[in-house]
Amino acid sequence: MEMKQINETTLKIMITMEDLEEHGMELKDFLIPQEKTEEFFYTVMDELDLPDNFKNSGMLSFRVTPRKDRVDVFVNKSDLKEALDFNDLSDMEDYSGLSPEEFLKALEDNFMDKGDIEAHHKLEEHDKTLKEVDETMTEPAKEVAEETIREDYTHYVLAFSDFDQVVTFAQGLKNVSVEGSEFYKLGDVYYMTILLYLADEPDYYANNMYARFLEYANVADRTRPYLQEHATILMEEDALPVLQATKWS
């Protein structure tokens, strides 16, 4: 493993396939938010000699970029103390009875409570650096990454013009089960990432599901890595089932 400091708030860790294997990790492990992935990230950081300003810091965010012969992990340091956990809303009297607008405001207020406004604005300042980092990923590397995950999984990014459209999407797909889903807000637009497991499904399954999604959602103009770094994440896992199970007033 090798580490390079891009600037005071961003590290780049280069992990070989052999390193992944030694730690019991596979590329597909990075597609689904889980404790195993988070533990791996912090194990790697413990093994490396981190710069002093990254030790005992606030919240760290991670982004994975697959390469042909390695995985690049970009570690971003912020002043936030912790990330939003949907379980934090458990102390609300009855969020299932909220209107869509009230539900959304509760999510956003909960997120902003995790750190001061200045800290959140600092996250946006990483835009230029992360954009330059994105441009270092060559087309062949992207193709390798796509081929790697295409066998068992596929993911989509969907856009919604307002929260009412999100609610309609969730209600219209109440019988649909997905492997993973995340919910973001960027500007006035809402985004949802959907991860589908394809190994046990017929060849046409992915196309059919995408067509169903687009009955209620729009094609997104942002990628998941972009949203991870630039958007406000409202629900970082199980977004679709949570919205499906919510009763709107």
UniProtKB/Swiss-Prot annotation:
InterPro entries hit by this protein: MecA_C_sf, Neg-reg_MecA
GO terms, molecular function: protein-macromolecule adaptor activity
Top-rank taxon: Bacteria
Pfam name, any one: MecA
Assembly and oligomerization: Homodimer.
Function: Enables the recognition and targeting of unfolded and aggregated proteins to the ClpC protease or to other proteins involved in proteolysis.
Record remark on domains: The N-terminal domain probably binds unfolded/aggregated proteins; the C-terminal domain interacts with ClpC.
Similarity comment: family membership: Belongs to the MecA family.
Protein name (record): Adapter protein MecA
Origin species: Streptococcus thermophilus (strain CNRZ 1066)
